[in-house]
Amino acid sequence: MTAFTDSITHAHSPSPLTKGTPLALDAITKHYGHRTVLNDVQLRIPSGQFVAIVGRSGCGKSTLLRLLAGLEAASSGELLTGTAPLSSAKDDTRLMFQEARLLPWKKVIDNVGLGLRGNWREKAQDALTSVGLADRANDWPAALSGGQKQRVALARALIHHPRLLLLDEPLGALDALTRIEMQSLIENIWLQHGFTVLLVTHDVSEAIALADRVILIEEGRVGLDITVDLPRPRRRGSAKLAELEARVLERVLAPTSSPLPQQAAI
């Protein structure tokens, strides 16, 4: 059977079971007509890193994720994995949205295995087990809560063994408790499989709790690039997390002053 069912609660770094996709963004610029949404973005993201991208609405963070997913093309610049175009890794990339986007006329297990051929049902069942929904395989999506629907969407991504997982506000519509449960689930699965993660979120506390690195996008540029050098599992409400969260929030809420990135670690 496919090894989806292991549980890791106290790991400190991702295992190499699935090698993550390394990313290089060289001078990425994106225009919509006369409006520049991303402006000369330069980033290096190593294999297996968990990166959170934060910023005000309209700053370009979701646009950046869409470029990485291949849903849109950059106006200029290069997206690379190693020395190859990132488009060469599209089969290893999966994207989760704020809405689960399940097909209501298909049962849960069929949504997980959507588009697959051959003997996929066992793999789909394993993926559902890994997200805690082993007993909901034959239910209809309408019978699920919002959090359960997002778990199905996560299982649908996991069945493809992604090396790059892109998360565009996937927890934004969930209640506080369900959101914390989903955060823990995503973190544990990442620790187990070792893929590269880019999470776009408006929730700075979520970014600090989950990520190895938090990047703030300001007016289409990297305004802040912070390493979260704290052991896992992270204790919510700790002084160090609160200190780092306050620093990022202060920058998010302040008027933009300089487009140059600042780097720090805590």
Swiss-Prot record:
Subcellular location(s) per record: Cell inner membrane
Main location as per UniProt: membrane
Alphabetized GO MF terms: ATP binding; ATP hydrolysis activity
Protease is among the record's keywords: no
Keywords: ATP-binding, Cell inner membrane, Cell membrane, Membrane, Nucleotide-binding, Translocase, Transport
GO CC annotation: plasma membrane
Catalytic reaction annotation: ATP + H2O + aliphatic sulfonate-[sulfonate-binding protein]Side 1 = ADP + phosphate + aliphatic sulfonateSide 2 + [sulfonate-binding protein]Side 1
Domain of life: Bacteria
Protein topology in the membrane: Peripheral membrane protein
Family matches, as SUPFAM superfamilies: P-loop containing nucleoside triphosphate hydrolases
Domain ABC transporter: 23-244
Family from the record: Belongs to the ABC transporter superfamily. Aliphatic sulfonates importer (TC 3.A.1.17.2) family.
PANTHER family: ALIPHATIC SULFONATES IMPORT ATP-BINDING PROTEIN SSUB, TAURINE IMPORT ATP-BINDING PROTEIN-RELATED
Protein name from the UniProt record: Aliphatic sulfonates import ATP-binding protein SsuB
